[in-house]
Structures are given as structure tokens and as C-alpha cells.
Amino acid sequence: MTTKRKPYVRGMQPNWWTKLGFYRFYITREGTCLPQLWFSLVVLFGVFALKNGPESWAGFVGFLSNPILMLINIVTLIATVFHTATWFKLAPKAVNIVVKDEKLPQEPIVRGLWGLTIVVTVVILAVALIV
């Protein structure tokens, strides 16, 4: 049996996500994938430039010294720190660490992740400056 009635289709505005703070935050966090894509492509381009010799590397460094690219890279850095901070706050919610029959609070886990990030960053910078 068929009917001629149309099913109700609720309207959806293109800016539906701007009405609630949770959705704005979620879309902003997920939007950080675009600067991450940019960073990945720049690193990939740099690896190929390094592989192709000094002239190619000099061209890559010249490419990166463009003021517009510096601005884009600063935005990418800010987006990366934001993305990292949100994931570090999310990580303790995904794991249950029990110490002496009590659940470990979120703060030590987040601080540990930031501490590990700082240590790894310092080690990488030290190796880069030594070599």
C-alpha cells in the first residue's frame, strides 16, 4: 500500500553548529585537521627537498621565508597546540588508572602528557642543534 503523504523532513540550517557552544568547540577542534594537513605537506615537501640536494633545500628554505607562509605556520602552530591541549584533556577520560583502589584524577595524567611533550621537544631540539 502506498500513500501520498510526504514524510516530515526537519529543516537544517548550514550554521546549525554555531548555536551551541559544545558544537562550536567540537567543529573548531575537528577543523584543526586542515592546519595539520598543511604541516604534513610542508614536512613532506621538505624531506623531498632535502633528498634532492642543496639547491632544492635552499629553494625550500626560501619558500618558507615568505611572510605569508610564516603567518600560515604561526596559525598552524596555534592550531596544533589547541588540538594537543584538547586531546590531552580527553585522554584521561578514555583510560581508568586505578592506584590503591582509587581512580587516578585527570590532572596528573594531563600534566604527565604535557611534561612528556616538553621533554621530547627539548630532546629533539638538542639533537637538531648538536648535529
Swiss-Prot record:
Cell location: Cell inner membrane
Membrane topology: Multi-pass membrane protein
Subunit structure, interactors included: Part of an enzyme complex containing four subunits: a flavoprotein (FrdA), an iron-sulfur protein (FrdB), and two hydrophobic anchor proteins (FrdC and FrdD).
The entry's keywords: Cell inner membrane, Cell membrane, Membrane, Transmembrane, Transmembrane helix
Top-level taxon of the source organism: Bacteria
Role played: Two distinct, membrane-bound, FAD-containing enzymes are responsible for the catalysis of fumarate and succinate interconversion; fumarate reductase is used in anaerobic growth, and succinate dehydrogenase is used in aerobic growth. Anchors the catalytic components of the fumarate reductase complex to the cell inner membrane, binds quinones.
Record's GO cellular component terms: fumarate reductase complex; plasma membrane
Residues annotated as transmembrane: 30-50, 58-78, 109-129
Stored Pfam families: Fumarate_red_C
HAMAP family recorded: Fumarate_red_C
Disulfide pattern: none
Protein name in UniProt: Fumarate reductase subunit C
CDD domains for the chain: QFR_TypeD_subunitC
Organism: Proteus vulgaris
Family: Belongs to the FrdC family.
GO MF term list: succinate dehydrogenase activity
